[in-house]
Amino acid sequence: LLKGVIDCPDLPLNVSRSALQNDGFVKKISDYITKKVADKLTGMCKTDRETYEKYWDDIAPFIKFGCLKDEKFAEKMDDYIIYKNLDGKYLTLKDCMDKAKEEGHENQIYYVTNEKEQSQYINMFRSQGMDAVILKHNIDSAFITHAERYNEHVTFQRIDADLTNDMKDESGEDLTDATNALTDLFRKVLDKKDLTVKVENLKDENVSSMVTLSEESRRMQDMMKMYGMTGMDPSMFGGQETLILNAKHPLVQYILKN
């Protein structure tokens, strides 16, 4: 993408890492290279979007890492970070926000981290005409926090973090008795006294159940894994899964009757 040579006769002959890290000329060179890379990338996105998209999957982790490490680089690249959606199209953050507004969840961007594991949720989203972006690299967990900080009012939420209103059938049916009965049953069978159970009428009658985990709890768990705190109990941070049962599904109806 970018080739060249930088001539700097003022660099010290001592090339030890500690000396170079504290050298003013090295810092200037680093800033200059960062600027040239950002200029090249933004220019390509403006004038040759097709080529930019072709390279994106390979260079995205490095660009996102650069945004996390260098504030000036992040400012230059903010409008040129692109996200692949469920149809394989690349969208800027502004495109994602415009699409979210059209779908009725303004400022809320849904994302997928594993297309196979979350296929059921993806199918439910597609059936309601909703879209999501694919963020499956390890760095994406930290990057979406960065994107939310730099873009006021923007929030990212994984598609299995909660049940959206678009997926519910607001029939007005009282499900209190069903919820109480199924909560007692599943807590006993699964031996989880604190299990949260919700019973909803879902539009998709083929889905019997879903398990959701709040975005905040998921990010806390991701942070624990990142910093090697896997031995700690996630429940100490208040993050617990919620079991959602579809009252329209024959299996759930059978359990209620029997």
Predicted regions located by residue number:
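Conserved GHKL (Bergerat-fold) ATPase module
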Residues: 1-258
